[in-house]
Amino acid sequence: MKQETNTPNAFTSSELLQCDVSGATSPTTRTKGTRGGSEPRDGVLQEIGGVNAMPAATWGWLKMNQTKLELSDELAAAPAEAVEVEGLDEQFAGSADAFDAAMDAMAERFPERRTAAPGDAADRARITPETELNVPATSVYQAGAIKLEEELAPAEAFETGMGEAAYTYLAGHATKRIVIDVPAYGRATVTARVSGVDAAAAIAAIDVVARPQATLDLQIALDSPVAGEGVVGSVLRVCAHEYATVNVTCTQTLDDSWIALDDTGLFLDEGARVNVQHTVLGAGASATGLAGDLLGDTAKVTIDTDYLGAREQVRDFNYELRHRGRKTECEIDANGVLTGTSKKVYRGTIDLVHGCKGATGTERETVLLANKGVDNKTVPVILCDEDDVAGNHGATIGHVRDEQLFYLACRGLDQNAAEDLFIRAKLEDAALSATDERTRAAVVRLGNNLIDNFEEELA
């Protein structure tokens, strides 16, 4: 497989973040200087590589295998008030180690490892020096997958979508740690609101343990009610026990001067259900990653993503769902609009692991390109090591034709006004489907900053 050795042009938001596909995977630092015509700023940038990396890399020249973050070392820790928690009653507040303890206990629930298959330990033991040249080599991904399936307990195999380096940064800079432990047959509704603080990192670290047949509705709101620049984000870990249901809604309404980081990891036991809604509307640069381990039979994950890219904004997505249980299901749907000179990378990987008989996975993306200046990259991937499975993937890309723009121009709408129509439609949909009044108000605030008379016409 081709190795990545080039470093393409990077993107930046307030000189704090860049994206490329260089091979670096460990944090490094460099002095911050002038880039892209921006005013010089003193300080040091911390580079975090291997972010939102695809589990099985594709061609390096596509420049979409992974992302690199550059975050200022001078960002202060946001005050605790930057993260508000609503609805977390004492009966649902878990101990600090509740998630780790729950994952450790899964080793007893799932003691078995990979069943016999080509490339397993027994197969490798039969290889002799005389025959090894006749045996097909395994890729880096295949070797890692075999190790995961043969040797790693559920807790060791657990991962988040943005990767280990990004998780370490987010967890290490968490403004507030929230542990939600819903008892068996219980039901809880919890909201976490993260507000941007100028020159600071405001991050909510959330652990969720949903006991057997429990139900949790979790809303996460990332917003910037005051002017400034910095990092706003969340890192979420979910352990869903047998037949538990976890519904996660994350709405991001930051202004362009902010960076948004949203990292999620899921573990599903038998019959568990996790439904995720990502709504990405603002931030000059945003990175969203989600990884799910469907180890229990008949577990199901549903992901719906709505996004908007405008002006010079950058959107970066990575979804990885690993099917290990029998008759597991996943559905990934993404729908977005790109205008101006915005950029977007979408990676969606469904991994049908050996032994997941009867599993089905579907991923779809629909994106409207409203300007010829946008940069759109989409890579839906199906990895398969089982025969009795079904995997479906596809992407639909539409654009506004010149004759349509001419028609609008004849009626007094120039290119910018035409793009505002699509931006308004996406924001109106988000406002109407907001989970509560504060989230709706945040969408309206963002809309008012982008479009004239947004609130008046919405009403």
Question: Which role fits each region the language model picked out?
Answer:
Residues 1-245, 250-252:
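Short, low-to-moderate order helix/coil transition modules at the start of elongated helical scaffolds
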Residues 19, 41, 46-47, 55, ...:
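Conserved beta-strand/loop scaffold segments within soluble protein domains that form the structured core
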